[in-house]
């Protein structure tokens, strides 16, 4: 999958957010809060985790570029492709990487389902508003810290968000279908 340009990034986000949202909307409400095992997240917890992990993306996209440069620096390496970033993420997970505490959800009730779906889709709307304001070259220039992947470019952060949403969709489909 060749994803590089801003319209492709937006399209990838829209597709994965829509598929995840549709799947969750069609899941019976009583299953939204139930976990298949104590160490596994419920569908609601997966959704809450995705919201928690998408909010910083919006923060980065709205942050002045001089602040990004001052806080984190600029890229000095070859940028990873979508596929290479996904492979690095899978490798980190295989090595035992997990969500750090700020991104771990607490119990989520079935009553929160539609509020969380709305909040998740609102995060996508914010990305879709902010991302086109970026110049393509700046997506590759500025870097930000990622708790599992280290310093990554803003484009790689968007790659991650596309894949991360897909990863959680596939997980809940496997665990709760």
What are these model-derived regions, one by one?
Residues 27-28, 135:
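Residues that cap or delimit alpha-helices
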Residues 1-8, 56-119:
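Short, helix-capping/interhelical loops that line the mouth of catalytic, cofactor-
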Residues 6, 13, 116-120, 158-161:
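Hydrophobic packing residues in well-ordered alpha-helices of helical domains and bundles
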Residues 2-5, 9-12, 23, 31-47:
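Charge-rich, low-complexity N-terminal segments
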Residues 33-86, 125, 131-177:
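Short, contiguous alpha-helical
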Residues 22, 120-130:
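Amphipathic alpha-helical packing segments from all-alpha helical-bundle domains
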Residues 30-31, 100-108, 144-148:
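A short small-residue
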């Amino acid at each position: 999958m060749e994803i590089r340009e801003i319209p492709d990034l937006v399209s990838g986000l829209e597709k994965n957010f829509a598929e995840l949202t549709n799947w969750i909307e069609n899941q019976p409400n009583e299953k939204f809060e139930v976990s298949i095992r104590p160490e596994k997240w419920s569908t609601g917890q997966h959704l809450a985790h995705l919201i928690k992990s998408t909010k910083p993306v919006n923060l980065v996209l709205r942050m002045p570029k001089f602040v990004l440069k001052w806080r984190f620096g600029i890229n000095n390496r070859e940028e990873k492709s979508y596929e290479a970033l996904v492979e690095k993420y899978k490798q980190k997970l295989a090595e035992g990487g997990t969500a750090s505490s700020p991104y771990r959800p607490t119990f989520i009730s079935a009553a929160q389902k539609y509020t969380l779906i709305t909040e998740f889709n609102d995060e996508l709307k914010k990305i879709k508003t902010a991302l086109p304001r970026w110049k393509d070259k700046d997506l590759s220039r500025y870097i930000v810290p990622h708790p599992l992947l280290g310093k990554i470019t803003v484009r790689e952060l968007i790659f991650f968000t596309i894949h991360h949403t897909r990863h959680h969709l596939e997980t809940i489909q496997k665990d709760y279908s």
